[in-house]
Every structure is written in C-alpha cells, then in structure tokens.
Design a protein with these regions (language model features):
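Glycine/small-residue-rich hydrophobic helix-like segments
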Residues: 185-238
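Active-site/acyl-donor-binding loops of N-acyltransferases
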Residues: 104, 110, 115-135, 198-200, ...
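A conserved beta-strand-loop-helix scaffold within acyl/acetyltransferase catalytic domains
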Residues: 14-73, 161-202
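Amide-forming acyltransferase catalytic core, primarily the GNAT-like/NAT-type
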Residues: 115-195, 205-206
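Conserved GNAT acetyl-CoA-binding A-motif
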Residues: 86, 92-105, 218-228, 248
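Conserved acetyl-CoA-binding loop-helix of GNAT-fold acetyltransferases
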Residues: 72, 78-91, 114, 204-216, ...
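Short amphipathic alpha-helix that is part of the acyltransferase structural core
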Residues: 1-35, 39, 46, 51, ...
Length: 274
C-alpha cells in the first residue's frame, strides 16, 4: 500500500471517521464513533496528504467480538484497503481467542465468505420517512428501565454482557427507552435519522407493544433493523409506513454458531454494534 500508512484509530481521527460514514451513506454520528472507539479499538489507513481512506473496528464482547465499520472512501476502493484491515482485525481477534462476528450488506457478504465467514440469520433495515403519517395504538408499556432485568434478558439474547453499550444508548434517546417484564427497547440519534434498537422481548406481541410505545415518543426520519424471523413485526412496521432500505446477514467466522438466542431479538442495535 504505497503512499499510505496503517495506524490505530483514535479520537484524533474522528473527522475522518465521520467522512467515511457520510461517503457510505451510513447513519453514524460523532457520538456513535466515540462510543465504538471507547468500547473497542480499530485501525485506519491514512494517505500521505492526511486523508483517512479506510477504517475497521472491533468491539469485544467476552468470548466473541464484532467487526465493524469496514469502510473505504469511494475514490479509494479496489486498492485492497478493506481486505487488508479486515485481515488485521481477524489476526487481532485470533490472538485474543475471540470469535469474529459481523453483519454484512449484500455487497460485502461474498467478500466475507471468502475470508472464512458463514451465514447465520438475517434482518432488514426499514426506514420511516419524514412527513409520513403514522397511526400507533394508544396503549402500551410505560415503565422505566429496570437495569438488572434488562441486562439479564439482553445477556440471554445477545450471548454476552454489553452493559456499557446499553447504558450509553439509554442516555442517547431516553424518551424512547421502555421496559416491561418481558422486554425492552432503546434508541439513539444518528447522522441521518433516529434509530430504534436493540429491542429484545420474549415474544412478538411484547415486541410490537414496546415498539408502538417507543414510536409514539419520536418523529421520523427513523431507522429500525428488524429481524427476518419475525414476519408479523415486519408486516406491522410496513403498515405503519416503513419501507425496506437494505438487507443484512449476520455472519460468524469459522464453524461456530451465532451466540445468544436470536429468537429473543426483534430489532438489532445496528450492524455496527450487534
């Protein structure tokens, strides 16, 4: 990679990281990047003129880790930057004995398969555009977060504790954070839109109840990443005016299975967070 330098990512690279998100039309804002850099670590490739051309992050979660933000500026693609940083991340996780996991777009899925990842389950990003009229039920859960129960349920669903992440998200969009005895939902603000997720619940009815409550507190534009194993939830979202934006596939490196219990997950936190 003549004419470029590989280096660890830090807060001094925030402007370049945000430029990568904008170029890819992703929703991360500065708070997202600060969260990911604080809870994980990453690498970048910077050109000799100081431009951050590519990035990759890893977010460790006990026995596994999320590979995230594999981004390259459009004008510097097809130079091997993404593959190189992905392999740097894989080597780092191999040394730490952590199983790599990621959420792939259709464009990245084949690349990741060639690097040893395999499909597990899938979800779709749905968006609600500004100005769309929504009609949500009048009744729903109305409980403050009970952290002990939230963390226990999330650990069962996700497969590891991610308390720092959840507590951070609870401060980002507190009016949309709700808890019942059978589930919880959180959200955050983003560069392009608000985003709801994660939403973890014991069943689909509980998930729809939580989501309807959260939706009454916020206005579009809005993103949700809804799992494909809950077709009734996706149908309900479509009836509220949400439209499909893009699919994702959750992939695990090697022969392992995805951790946790995906049947409890209804909205993921986002492909960058898990």
């Amino acid at each position: 990679m003549t004419g470029s330098i590989e280096h660890p990512l830090g807060e001094q690279h925030l402007a370049g990281c945000l430029a990568l998100s904008r170029a890819a039309n992703w929703n991360q804002n500065e708070a997202d990047w600060r969260l990911m850099l604080a809870t994980g670590h990453g690498w970048g490739i910077t050109l000799l003129d100081g431009t951050l051309a590519a990035s990759t992050l890893v977010l460790p979660y006990q026995t596994f880790a999320w590979i995230s933000m594999v981004l390259v500026l459009p004008e510097h693609r097809r130079k091997g930057y993404a593959t190189h940083l992905l392999r740097v991340a894989l080597a780092d996780l191999r040394n730490r004995a952590l199983t790599p996991i990621l959420d792939a777009t259709p464009a990245g899925r084949e690349v990741y398969r060639q690097e040893g990842f395999r499909d597990t389950w899938s979800f779709k990003r749905l968006q609600l555009e500004k100005g769309v009229r929504t009609l949500f039920p009048e009744k729903g859960p109305d409980s403050a977060l009970a952290w002990e129960k939230v963390l226990r349920l999330d650990r069962e669903a996700f497969g590891a504790s991610r308390e720092p992440l959840l507590r951070n998200l609870a401060t980002r969009l507190p009016r949309a954070a709700f808890f019942t005895e059978v589930g919880f939902v959180l959200g955050r603000e983003g560069r392009e839109a608000l985003q709801l997720g994660p939403l973890v619940a014991r069943d689909e009815d509980a998930a729809i109840g939580l989501l309807s409550q959260a939706l009454r507190t916020i206005a579009p534009p809005l993103y949700v990443d809804a799992v494909d194993h809950a077709p009734r939830l996706q149908e309900w979202l479509t009836k509220q005016g949400f439209v499909s934006q893009r699919p994702f596939t959750r992939m695990v490196h090697g022969a392992g299975r995805a951790p946790g219990n995906e049947k409890l997950v209804y909205l993921v936190a986002g492909p960058e967070l898990g």
